[in-house]
């Protein structure tokens, strides 16, 4: 849970990864937003363009990890901390965004 991973919030979904409690990522503190900007990479460990360099990965939510507004990003972003049990399982219903029984969290 406290394993440091400076790349956990990177990618085009960087901001959702930092701000979505179900994304599998978190910041060390509320003042550390990990990301350089909305769409750029988060801290790389060098501190360039970042407030802090200690971005950490949170323990993914144990249920409903791919649901909500960021459902697609959570299911498709390898850095999101979530995964689907199979490639054909999108985890969430795109219409009402309800939880799927087969949704799983990645380790």
UniProtKB/Swiss-Prot annotation:
InterPro entries: Metalthion_7
Metal-binding found in the keyword field: yes
GO molecular function: cadmium ion binding
Keyword annotations from UniProtKB, A to Z: Cadmium, Metal-binding, Metal-thiolate cluster
A Pfam family per the record: Metallothio_Cad
Regions annotated as coiled coil: none
Superkingdom, taxonomy of origin: Eukaryota
The keyword Endoplasmic reticulum belongs to this UniProt entry's keyword annotation: no
Role of this protein: The metallothioneins are involved in the cellular sequestration of toxic metal ions. Binds 12 cadmium ions per molecule.
Family of this protein: Belongs to the metallothionein superfamily. Type 7 family.
Identification of the protein by name: Metallothionein-1
């Amino acid at each position: 849970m406290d394993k440091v991973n400076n790349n956990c919030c990177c990618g085009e979904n960087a901001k959702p990864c930092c701000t979505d409690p179900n994304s599998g990522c978190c910041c060390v503190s509320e003042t550390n937003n990990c990301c350089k900007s909305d769409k750029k990479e988060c801290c790389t460990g060098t501190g360039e363009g970042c407030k802090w360099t200690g971005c950490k990965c949170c323990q993914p939510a144990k249920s409903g990890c791919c649901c909500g507004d960021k459902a697609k990003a959570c299911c498709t972003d390898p850095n999101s901390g979530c995964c689907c049990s199979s490639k054909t399982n999108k985890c969430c219903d795109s219409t009402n965004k309800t939880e799927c029984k087969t949704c799983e969290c990645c380790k």
